[in-house]
C-alpha cells in the first residue's frame, strides 16, 4: 500500500469528520428533568400526547389553536424559547395472546402476519422549554462565589418550574383530561441501580436516528452523546452506527404561505417514512416586533403593484400585536427525512415536498450548511438555526398543533391486554377494547362499562367484524380460572359457522321443531319458582286476558307440586295433570295451557308443545363457553317470541355470575322489538358491568333501534361506538340519535364502502380504524356466514357427522373451493 496515498485517503476522511462535542451545547443534568448548557441556558423537555384531530369539530380545533396561542403569549419573553419535535418513526406493534382454539390461533397468526406486512408507525411530539437567564446574568457569574451561583441557578430552576406548570396545566386541558396528556422527561433507575435519562435518549435519537436508552454520564454530556459517525455530503448525510447505517436529507421552508391554520402539516402524519420535524420559536420584544411589521408594511407600500389587502392585514396585525393578541418571534423549521436506501430517501423527500407545497409553502432541500441544519435540531443550539423567519405565535400554533391519532390502550384495561390490534390509514396501531378507561390508569380487575354499539348498512362488513371480535375474545378464556362465556343472539345464521369453529354450541329455533327447552326442570330455588310463575302465567294468558287470582293460585300450587317430583318427570303435560278441573276457571286454565303441552288434557296434542314440553332441558349456560342462538324464525312468531325470550334471558342471567361475560346481538332492533328483550337490554345496559359483563349491539337499521323504548339506554350506556361506512347515512339519526358530531357524520359518509374502514369512538376520542382481511379467504369464509358458505358448511357437517371442528373445517374449505371452481 502506498503510505503517502493511504495517509491522503485517511486525511480526506478525517477532514469530513469532526468531533461532534463542539456542536452539542449541553453540559450536564442540573436536576433530573433539567439540563444546563455551557452558556447556562436551562433545558427541559416534555412528551406531549397530542390530540385526535380526525373527527374533531372545527370549532374545537380553533379553540385549541387559540389555547396554544394564549399559552405561547403567556410564557413569552426574551428569556424563553421553544423547540418542538414531531418524530415519525417505526414501532413494534403486537399483542401477546394465547388461544386454546385452533381456528382462533390460525386466524390470529394470519391476521398478525398481514399486519406485519406493513410497517407500523407512530407519531411522537416533544416540547422543549429553553430558559436563558440573560447575558447580564451570565457576565456576573464569574464574579460570584459558588454559593451565589447556586442561589441564582435555583432561582432560574424555580422560574422554569413556574413556566412548566403553566405549560402542563394548559396542555392537559388541551387534550384528554389525564396525566399522560403531557409528561416531563426525567431520569429513572433500573433494578441494577443504573440511572437513565429520557431527555438524553431523545437527544441521542436526534443525533443518530436510533432510539436507545442513554445513561446519565459521570462526565460532560456533550462528550457522551452521539454514537454514530456523521458524514455530511452535498445534500445528504450518513449516520453510520456500529450495526447499520442510515441516510438523512433535510427540507426547509424557502417561502411561507400567506396564512396558517391549525393542522397545516397534518398530511405528513400519514406518510410511510421516518422523519423528524423541528420547529423553534423565540419571542422578540414588542418594540422589535412592531418595528418589523412597520418595515414590512412600508416595503409593500413602496411596491407599485402593492397588494392593498396585504397592507391592510399588516395594519391589523400591528393593532393586534399592541393589544396583546399574539407575540412575534424568530421561527425556524427543518424536516429531517431518514432512510436506509439513498434512492428511496430521495423519493420520500420528493413526497414530503409535495405535501408541504400543497399547503402553500415553498419547500426546498437543504444543500448549504447541511450540518448546521442537523445540529439546529438540538434545543438551545442557537447558532445553527438557518433561514429564520419572523412569525406570530398564532402562526406558530398553527404549524405546531400537536395533532395526532388516538391509539387506544394496550395494557391495563379491565380485562388486561387490549382485545385486538387494528390498523389505521396513518399506519399507527390502534389497540381496541370494548371497555373505555383512562390511558394512565391500571384498571385491571375493575368492573367498568364496556357496552358497544356497531352501526353499519348491509354489506359493510358488520358480520365479519362481529365474528372477528368474538374470536379475539377467546384469549380471555384461558386468562384465569373464571373463564369467559359469550352468548350470540344471531339472525340469519351469520355467526353459526364461526361459533361452531370455536367448538361452541349453536341453537336454531324453528317453528314446529322441538327446542330442547324444559323450564320445569330448573332447580327448585325461590328465583326459579318466581320465574316459572311469571312464565306460565304468560303462557296461560289468552288474547291479553289476564288470569284471575284463583287461576294464579291454582297454577302456583301445580308448579310447586311438579317441582317436588324427580326432574325426569317434570313436563308441561305433567303440570296439566296436576291442575284440578273442579271449576270453570280451572277448566279454562287447563284449556289455555293445553296448547303448550304434548298431551293437551283432551286427548290431543297442543299446537305449541315443541316450545317447552321436551323430555330434557338442553339449555345450559353454566359452563364457560361460546353459545349461539338463531332467532330468524321465532322472532317473527308473535305467539312464541316473548315466552322463548323470557326463558333464554332467565337462563342467561345465571351465567352472569362474575365470570367474564359478553352477549352479542346482531340486528339488535329485531331482538329488542320483543318486550322481554327490550326490558332486559335496557336494564342490563345499566347493571351488566357490575357483573363483569358487557353487551355488543349491531344493526343496519338505526331508525328501528332509535325508535325502541329502551333507545336512551342503548345510546347513552355505551363505552364504545363503531360506525361502518354509510354514504346514505341519515343526518338526523346520526347527529340527533347517536350524538355524532358533524365531522364524525361526514367521515362516516365519506369512507368508501369497500375500504374496510370504520370509525371507533370512545368518550371524546375517535379514530378511523381498519379491519382488512383481504387474502385471508379461508378465515373470511368462516367469519362471513353468507348463504353459499352455509350450504357448504351443512354439507361438511353431514359428511363428518359433526365431529371436531378440525375435521369439518377441512372438508368445508374443500367443498367451498369446489363450489367456486364450478365442480359442484
Swiss-Prot record:
Instruction: Give the top-rank taxon of the lineage listed in the UniProt record for this protein.
Output: Bacteria
Subcellular location field: Cell membrane
- The record lists the membrane-crossing segments as none
Record's Gene Ontology CC terms?
A: plasma membrane
Induction text: Cotranscribed with ptxABCDE. Activated by the two-component regulatory system BvgS/BvgA.
Binding positions for ATP per the UniProt entry = 456-463
Which is an annotated GO molecular function term of this record?
ATP binding
What UniProt keywords apply to this chain's record, in alphabetical order?
ATP-binding, Cell membrane, Membrane, Nucleotide-binding, Transport
Q: What does this protein do?
A: Component of the type IV secretion system ptl essential for secretion of assembled pertussis toxin (PTX) through the outer membrane.
| Family of the protein in this entry | Belongs to the TrbE/VirB4 family.
The record's listing under PANTHER family reads: TYPE IV SECRETION SYSTEM PROTEIN CAGE, UNCHARACTERIZED PROTEIN YJGR-RELATED
What is the recorded name of this protein? Type IV secretion system protein PtlC
Organism, per UniProt? Bordetella pertussis (strain Tohama I / ATCC BAA-589 / NCTC 13251)
* The gene coding this protein: ptlC
Amino acid at each position: 500500500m502506498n503510505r503517502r496515498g493511504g495517509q491522503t485517503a485517511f486525511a480526506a476522511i478525517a477532514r469530513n469528520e469532526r468531533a461532534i462535542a463542539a456542536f452539542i451545547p449541553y453540559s450536564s443534568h442540573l436536576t433530573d428533568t433539567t439540563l444546563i448548557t455551557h452558556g447556562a441556558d436551562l433545558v427541559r423537555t416534555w412528551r406531549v400526547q397530542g390530540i385526535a384531530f380526525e373527527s374533531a369539530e372545527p370549532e374545537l380545533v380553533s379553540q385549541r389553536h387559540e389555547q396554544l396561542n394564549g399559552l405561547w403569549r403567556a410564557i413569552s419573553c426574551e428569556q424563553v424559547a421553544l423547540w418542538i419535535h414531531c418524530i415519525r418513526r417505526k414501532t413494534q406493534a403486537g399483542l401477546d395472546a394465547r388461544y386454546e382454539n385452533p381456528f382462533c390461533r390460525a386466524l390470529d397468526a394470519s391476521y398478525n402476519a398481514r399486519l406485519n406486512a406493513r410497517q407500523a408507525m407512530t407519531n411522537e411530539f416533544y416540547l422543549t422549554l429553553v430558559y436563558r437567564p440573560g447575558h447580564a446574568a451570565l457576565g456576573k457569574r464569574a464574579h460570584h462565589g459558588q454559593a451565589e451561583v447556586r442561589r441564582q441557578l435555583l432561582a432560574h430552576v424555580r422560574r422554569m418550574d413556574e413556566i412548566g406548570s403553566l405549560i402542563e396545566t394548559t396542555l392537559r386541558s388541551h387534550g384528554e383530561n389525564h396525566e399522560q396528556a403531557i409528561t416531563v422527561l426525567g431520569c429513572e433507575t433500573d433494578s441494577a441501580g443504573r440511572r437513565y435519562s429520557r431527555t438524553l435518549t431523545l437527544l441521542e435519537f436526534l443525533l443518530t436516528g436510533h432510539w436507545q436508552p442513554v445513561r446519565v454520564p459521570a462526565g460532560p454530556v456533550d462528550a457522551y452523546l452521539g454514537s454514530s459517525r456523521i458524514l455530511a455530503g452535498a445534500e445528504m448525510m450518513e449516520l453510520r452506527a456500529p450495526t447499520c447505517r442510515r441516510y438523512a436529507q433535510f427540507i426547509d421552508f424557502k417561502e411561507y404561505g400567506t396564512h396558517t391554520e391549525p393542522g397545516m402539516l397534518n398530511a405528513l402524519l400519514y406518510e410511510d417514512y421516518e422523519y423528524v420535524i423541528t420547529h423553534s420559536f423565540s419571542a422578540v420584544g414588542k418594540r422589535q416586533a412592531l418595528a418589523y411589521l412597520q418595515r414590512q408594511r412600508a416595503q409593500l407600500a413602496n411596491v407599485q403593484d402593492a397588494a392593498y389587502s396585504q397592507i391592510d392585514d399588516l395594519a391589523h396585525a400591528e393593532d393586534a400585536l399592541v393589544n396583546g393578541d399574539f407575540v412575534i418571534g424568530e421561527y425556524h423549521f427543518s424536516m429531517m427525512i431518514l432512510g436506509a436506501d439513498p434512492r428511496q430517501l430521495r423519493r420520500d423527500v420528493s413526497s414530503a415536498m409535495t405535501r408541504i407545497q400543497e399547503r402553500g409553502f415553498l419547500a426546498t432541500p437543504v444543500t448549504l450548511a447541511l450540518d448546521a441544519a442537523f445540529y439546529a435540531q438540538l434545543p438551545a443550539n442557537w447558532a445553527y438555526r438557518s433561514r429564520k423567519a419572523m412569525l406570530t405565535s398564532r402562526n406558530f400554533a398553527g404549524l405546531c398543533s400537536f395533532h395526532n391519532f388516538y391509539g387506544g390502550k394496550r395494557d391495563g384495561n379491565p380485562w388486561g391486554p387490549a382485545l385486538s390490534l387494528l390498523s389505521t390509514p396513518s399506519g399507527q396501531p390502534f389497540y381496541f377494547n370494548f371497555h373505555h378507561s383512562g390511558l394512565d390508569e391500571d384498571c385491571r380487575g375493575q368492573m367498568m362499562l364496556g357496552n358497544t354499539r356497531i352501526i353499519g348498512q348491509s354489506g359493510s362488513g358488520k358480520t365479519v367484524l362481529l365474528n372477528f371480535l368474538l374470536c379475539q375474545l377467546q384469549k380471555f378464556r384461558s386468562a384465569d380460572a373464571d373463564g369467559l362465556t359469550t352468548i350470540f343472539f344471531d339472525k340469519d345464521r351469520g355467526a353459526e359457522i364461526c361459533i361452531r369453529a370455536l367448538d361452541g354450541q349453536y341453537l336454531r329455533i324453528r317453528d314446529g321443531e322441538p327446542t330442547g327447552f324444559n323450564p320445569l326442570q330448573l332447580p327448585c330455588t325461590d328465583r326459579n319458582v318466581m320465574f316459572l310463575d311469571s312464565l306460565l302465567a304468560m303462557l296461560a294468558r289468552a288474547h291479553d286476558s289476564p288470569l284471575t287470582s284463583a287461576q294464579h293460585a291454582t297454577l302456583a300450587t301445580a308448579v310447586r307440586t311438579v317441582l317436588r317430583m324427580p326432574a325426569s318427570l317434570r313436563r308441561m303435560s305433567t303440570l296439566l295433570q296436576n291442575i284440578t278441573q273442579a271449576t270453570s276457571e280451572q277448566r279454562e286454565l287447563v284449556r289455555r295451557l293445553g296448547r303448550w303441552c304434548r298431551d293437551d288434557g283432551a286427548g290431543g296434542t297442543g299446537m305449541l308443545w315443541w316450545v317447552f314440553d321436551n323430555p330434557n332441558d338442553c339449555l345450559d349456560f353454566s359452563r364457560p363457553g361460546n353459545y349461539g342462538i338463531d332467532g330468524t324464525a321465532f322472532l317473527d312468531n308473535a305467539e312464541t317470541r316473548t315466552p322463548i325470550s323470557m326463558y333464554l334471558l332467565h337462563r342467561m342471567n345465571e351465567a352472569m355470575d362474575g365470570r367474564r361475560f359478553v352477549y352479542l346481538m346482531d340486528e339488535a332492533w329485531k331482538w329488542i322489538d320483543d318486550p322481554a328483550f327490550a326490558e332486559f337490554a335496557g336494564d342490563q345496559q345499566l347493571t351488566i358491568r357490575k357483573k363483569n359483563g358487557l353487551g355488543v349491539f349491531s344493526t343496519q337499521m338505526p331508525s328501528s333501534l332509535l325508535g325502541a323504548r329502551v333507545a336512551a339506554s342503548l345510546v347513552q350506556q355505551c363505552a364504545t361506538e363503531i360506525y361502518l361506512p354509510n354514504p346514505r347515512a341519515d343526518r338526523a339519526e346520526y347527529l340527533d340519535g347517536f350524538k355524532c358530531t358533524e365531522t364524525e357524520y361526514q367521515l362516516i359518509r365519506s369512507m368508501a364502502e369497500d375500504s374496510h374502514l370504520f370509525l371507533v369512538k370512545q368518550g371524546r376520542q375517535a379514530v378511523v380504524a381498519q379491519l382488512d382481511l383481504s387474502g385471508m379467504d379461508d378465515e373470511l369464509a368462516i367469519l362471513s356466514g353468507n348463504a353459499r358458505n352455509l350450504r357448504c358448511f351443512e354439507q361438511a357437517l353431514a359428511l363428518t357427522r359433526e365431529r371436531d371442528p378440525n375435521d369439518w373445517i377441512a372438508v368445508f374449505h374443500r367443498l367451498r373451493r369446489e363450489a367456486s371452481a364450478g365442480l359442484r
